[in-house]
Curated annotation (Swiss-Prot):
Positions contributing to pyruvate binding: 47, 206
InterPro entries membership: Aldolase_TIM, DapA, DapA-like, Schiff_base-form_aldolases_AS
Enzyme class at the top of the EC tree: lyase
Lineage: Bacteria, Pseudomonadati, Bacteroidota, Flavobacteriia, Flavobacteriales
Protein name: 4-hydroxy-tetrahydrodipicolinate synthase
Record family assignment: Belongs to the DapA family.
Subunit description: Homotetramer; dimer of dimers.
Catalytic activity as recorded in UniProt: L-aspartate 4-semialdehyde + pyruvate = (2S,4S)-4-hydroxy-2,3,4,5-tetrahydrodipicolinate + H2O + H(+)
Residues flagged as site, Part of a proton relay during catalysis: 46, 109
Main location: cytoplasm
Swiss-Prot/TrEMBL GO biological process terms: diaminopimelate biosynthetic process; lysine biosynthetic process via diaminopimelate
The protein's role, per its UniProt record: Catalyzes the condensation of (S)-aspartate-beta-semialdehyde [(S)-ASA] and pyruvate to 4-hydroxy-tetrahydrodipicolinate (HTPA).
Keyword Lyase: yes
Length: 293
């Protein structure tokens, strides 16, 4: 799936000061990241604060992004959860005509075994009418999809086309790359180790910092894929401090502060998240201004 090689960005849901969805700001952000050179957009992922959105708000976010994108880039829709039957039902009833793939997170909170994870994604694969990208983020789900489970799924179901690997473990990523079928994508879900993963054979990234600074981060990814290592690492180290900063007080609080600094949206997040404090706000604002010089 060539469409998902490079930089995908996990779009935020911008809110007004009254916490309502800011559709105009969302359109500005879509145009900003497309102009910045990213390869695809991820809709209603973790960074979208999807857990705090009503169903009507989710539909509004989808419609707004589809309209703003206007067919320019492939769209990936986040559909996942810890109720397998509910996930399957949405996969069977959702209109996917504007989407190229689904991003589906490993079940959280229930802490399933590896066999439970396999059976969950077996049902997801059988229900989905479009390709599926698995999503492993044990820091949020409390269960790690081991390489053996991922590779078993990849070999058994051809519409499972890749994984967003966000365990933060480069050795685990390399085991996936080593054992994967030829066309299976191993996509970084951790901005800090994206470049090392690419150089180890990874396919790219689904990024948060790449949404805040799309021009610089997507260029780093392209240089890595082209094996222009020295040039890629110049950009990696240029951006490294900002990656730490945007996750310092929660995601997407950090990247929303960048958008506020850029004049694209408010920095409003919904509880239980809170906006970054004044110290971090000042540091992100300074970094953003220095990067644009």
């Amino acid at each position: 799936m060539q469409a998902f090689i490079g930089t995908g960005v996990a779009l935020v849901t911008p809110f007004k000061k009254d916490f309502s969805v800011d559709t105009q700001a969302l359109k500005r952000i879509v145009n900003y990241v497309i102009d910045g050179g990213v390869e695809y957009l991820v809709v209603l992922g973790t960074t979208a604060e999807s857990a705090t959105l009503s169903q009507d708000e989710k539909e509004l976010v989808i419609a707004t992004i589809v309209d703003a994108n206007n067919g320019r880039l492939p769209l990936v829709l986040g559909i996942g959860g810890n109720n397998t039957m509910k996930v399957v039902e949405e996969l069977k009833t959702r209109d996917f005509s504007k989407f190229s793939a689904v991003l589906s997170v490993s079940p959280y909170y229930n802490k399933p075994t590896q066999e439970g994870i396999y059976q969950h994604f077996k049902m997801v694969a059988e229900a989905s009418p479009i390709p599926v990208i698995l999503y492993n983020v044990p820091g949020r789900t409390a269960s790690n999809m081991l390489p053996e489970t991922v590779l078993r799924l990849a070999k058994d179901f051809k519409n499972l086309i890749g994984i967003k690997e966000a365990a933060g473990d480069i050795v685990q990523a390399m085991k996936l790359i080593q054992g994967k079928p030829k066309d299976f994508l191993v996509i970084s879900g951790d901005d800090m180790i994206t470049l090392p993963m690419i150089l180890a054979g990874g396919s790219g990234v689904i990024s948060v910092i790449g949404e805040g600074y799309p021009k610089e981060f997507s260029q780093m990814v392209r240089l890595g894929l082209q094996r222009k290592v020295d040039e890629a690492y110049i950009l990696h180290y240029k951006l490294m401090n900002s990656i730490d900063m945007i996750f310092e007080q929660g995601n997407p609080s950090g990247v929303k502060e960048i958008f506020k600094s850029l004049g694209l949206s408010e920095n409003t997040v919904r509880l239980p998240l809170v906006s970054v404090n004044e110290d971090l706000s000042n540091r992100l604002d300074l970094f953003t201004k220095q990067l644009s010089k």
